[in-house]
UniProtKB/Swiss-Prot annotation:
The gene is atpB. CDD domains: ATP-synt_F1_beta_C, ATP-synt_F1_beta_N, F1-ATPase_beta_CD. GO terms for cellular component: chloroplast thylakoid membrane; mitochondrion; proton-transporting ATP synthase complex. It comes from Albuca bracteata. ATP binds at residues 172-179. GO terms for biological process: proton motive force-driven mitochondrial ATP synthesis. This is ATP synthase subunit beta, chloroplastic. PANTHER family: ATP SYNTHASE, ATP SYNTHASE SUBUNIT BETA, MITOCHONDRIAL. It holds the Pfam family ATP-synt_ab. F-type ATPases have 2 components, CF(1) - the catalytic core - and CF(0) - the membrane proton channel. CF(1) has five subunits: alpha(3), beta(3), gamma(1), delta(1), epsilon(1). CF(0) has four main subunits: a(1), b(1), b'(1) and c(9-12). It catalyses: ATP + H2O + 4 H(+)(in) = ADP + phosphate + 5 H(+)(out).
Length: 495
């Protein structure tokens, strides 16, 4: 990554030759600015509005140029609230896109979309900044190695394994556990993972951001006593932020992750919660920018915007970015343009099901709806592949039999089908697992289950060795030995 050195002399002369414009129109978060002829800023340049409002309060609003309208006008989207701005106010063209601090000094800190620290710990100790708009790495730089990323979550590791250096999507409607699953993945992976992580909070609840920060301090991922030893940088643009901030905060987080990958040559984890809010923010400003709405009211540039973000999240020969993204599914409709566009970019999808959440099976991951390009015998091995397929077949058969059971009852099934149903119900319960981050709600200590243990457990259920155990023994346990111990306890309680 090239960082152009600037001497103090040229910086002074650049300030003297400031390109000034004036606000001509304000429509919510969108501003029209008039510049002198021949002095038009480039698209994506940052503009700064400084001044005082009618009450004398200081105003400092950064905007990003989106369109050149002709007649010496540009249209820009504000990154913070436009309250107090008036027509005729002076606007400064910075002559460059938004740039944010990057490098080791960002670890342990919380930033907003502009790269300004918001954690009251003082300024960031770095001179190195990077623009948030960059092109994706060239095809020849990409790394194509295939390896599994173990998460310690049974349902994920067995049925839809994650790729190291890949892109993973967690799909689900409101309240089915996307953020809890992301927090568990941060807990299991970021703690064990030697490299660094970047968390981009895009348009989600402020409370969740605060909880995550507190939890990271408790677990030592953020080291309060020595911030430099922290392992994560946090970038937040919450629900209450204007759409401009929510639209760009994902790029700010990605820029920080890219620096660790390209310059420090590290393996980076990038968590984004929630990628749908990035699309939603784009659709909010799209109409104000004069674009005709497309399907379901989304912006016509949906695929382009998503592609420009996702194509930068990749692994190169220098280092890797493994990205885990939560994707809100409006009205539980996976064919909605926002989740449907996201699907195309992912190596693995973890689909959360409201039906399983209603049954109390957590994580509520749909074992039949979740997919992964990694579930191939040449990558995961014959044994893993075969057991995953048999688990899916058993669950699929159970799903087909549910209508018959509902109408005629279990007794009308053949002996073979009854056995399939009994094993499927055990598998369904064994796919649940107590989470470390949910200990407060469940009262059960969290469990990390290695891949070998997971495969052994499902092998035993499918082989019929555990047919005599009650199905409730398999609910919310870690490995299979805990299930057999729980069955003995249940037996003892009955006596």
């Amino acid at each position: 990554m090239r960082i152009n050195p600037t001497t103090s002399g040229s910086a002074v002369s650049a300030l003297e030759e400031k390109n000034l414009g004036r606000i001509a129109q304000i429509i919510g978060p969108v501003l029209d600015v008039v510049f002198p002829p021949g002095k038009m800023p480039n698209i994506y340049n940052a503009l700064v509005v400084k001044g005082r409002d009618t009450v004398g309060q200081q105003i400092n609003v950064t905007c990003e140029v989106q369109q050149l309208l002709g007649n010496n006008r540009v249209r820009a989207v504000a990154m913070s609230a436009t309250d107090g701005l008036t027509r005729g106010m002076e606007v400064i063209d910075t002559g460059a896109p938004l740039s944010v601090p990057v490098g080791g000094a960002t670890l342990g800190r919380i930033f907003n979309v502009l790269g300004e620290p918001v954690d009251n710990l003082g300024p960031v100790d770095t001179r190195t900044t990077s623009p948030i708009h960059r092109s994706a790495p060239a095809f020849i730089q990409l790394d194509t190695k295939l390896s599994i990323f173990e998460t310690g979550i049974k349902v994920v590791d067995l049925l839809a394994p994650y790729r190291r250096g890949g892109k993973i999507g967690l799909f689900g409607g409101a309240g089915v556990g996307k953020t809890v699953l992301i927090m568990e993945l941060i807990n299991n992976i970021a703690k064990a993972h030697g490299g660094v992580s970047v968390f981009g909070g895009v348009g989600e609840r402020t409370r969740e951001g605060n909880d995550l920060y507190m939890e990271m301090k408790e677990s030592g991922v953020i080291n309060e006593k020595n911030i430099a030893e922290s392992k994560v940088a946090l970038v937040y643009g919450q629900m209450n932020e204007p759409p401009g901030a929510r639209m760009r905060v994902g790029l700010t987080a990605l820029t920080m992750a890219e620096y660790f990958r390209d310059v420090n040559e590290q393996d980076v984890l990038l968590f984004i919660d929630n990628i749908f809010r990035f699309v939603q923010a784009g659709s909010e400003v799209s109409a104000l920018l004069g674009r005709m709405p497309s399907a379901v009211g989304y912006q016509p540039t949906l695929s382009t915007e998503m592609g420009s973000l996702q194509e930068r999240i990749t692994s190169t020969k220098e280092g890797s970015i493994t990205s885990i993204q939560a994707v809100y599914v409006p009205a539980d409709d996976l064919t909605d343009p926002a989740p449907a566009t996201t699907f195309a970019h992912l190596d693995a999808t973890t689909v959360l099901s409201r039906g399983l959440a209603a049954k109390g099976i957590y994580p509520a991951v749909d074992p039949l709806g979740s997919t992964s390009t990694m579930l191939q015998p040449r990558i995961v091995g014959e044994e893993h592949y075969e057991i995953a397929q048999r688990v899916k077949q058993t669950l699929q058969r159970y799903k087909e039999l549910q209508d018959i059971i509902a109408i005629l009852g279990l007794d009308e099934l053949s002996e073979e089908d009854r056995l399939t149903v009994a094993r499927a119900r055990k598998i369904e319960r064994f796919l649940s697992q107590p989470f470390f981050v949910a200990e407060v709600f469940t009262g059960s200590p969290g469990k990390y289950v290695g891949l070998a243990e997971t495969i052994r457990g499902f092998q035993l259920i499918l082989s019929g060795e555990l047919d005599g155990l009650p199905e409730q023994a398999f609910y919310l346990v870690g490995n299979i030995d805990e299930a057999t111990a729980k069955a003995m306890n249940l037996e003892g309680e009955k006596k």
